[in-house]
Amino acid sequence: MILDLHTHSIKSDDGRAKVENYCKWIRKKEIPLDGFVLTEHRQYDSESDYRALEDEYNLLILKASEVETDYGHVLVFGVNEDLLHSFDFANIRLPIQTVLNAARENGAFAAPCHPGRKRVGLFSHYELSGPISDVHTVEVFNGGSIPGEDELSVKQAAIHGYKGFGGSDSHVVSRIGYCATTFESDSITTVEGLVGELQSGSFGPISLRPEPKNTTTEP
């Protein structure tokens, strides 16, 4: 089962993609995704209901969050009412330990995203402040990475013994599925099921970026 674990819709302040347009694009371009997770910035969208779109396009659509910490950005899967009351999702300087502890205590799963990125990536903070012992999984493939960032993420994840996953970090329709995560299970249907599979470690990152077009011409 292949899921894009990191996407943004117009619910995020910098997102320009409607969720239905993601679904249409996936089907039009025959992107081999079974679903995607909406990780809106600094919030959890508890109001939106995408079940009709799931049925129409035969895609799993789950909701999570991307929060900002003193060690960079972190994706939180399995957000529930107890977790929402554990810390302020809108705070842009959350202590990462607070997020990791609260996620664990409330049955959620927290993992740093784009860790190879400057300033907002985990590993740039490791250089200054040292590693965090409770981190065990990071996003090693990110569809918005510039050259060198994913390579750094993969290298540092290996050094620290972290499990890696992938996500497109799409903010526009055409970027969805650039990177994703392949799971051994083919029966994820809920966010609780996703959390269970993430906790099991039975997954890996995958790049689905389109091949660059050959602009050379024959003589």
Task: Give names to the regions the model predicted.
Residues M1-Y71, R93, P147, V172-S174:
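An N-terminally biased module of ancient metal coordination in phosphate/nucleic-acid-related enzymes
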Residues T7-D13, Y44-E47, D82-Y178, T182, ...:
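Domain-core and long-helix interface of multi-subunit machines
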Residues Y57, Y71-V74, E105-A108:
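Beta-strand-turn-beta hairpins that frame and shape the catalytic cleft
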Residues E66-A90:
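A basic- and aromatic-enriched beta-loop-alpha substructure that forms the phosphate/nucleotide-
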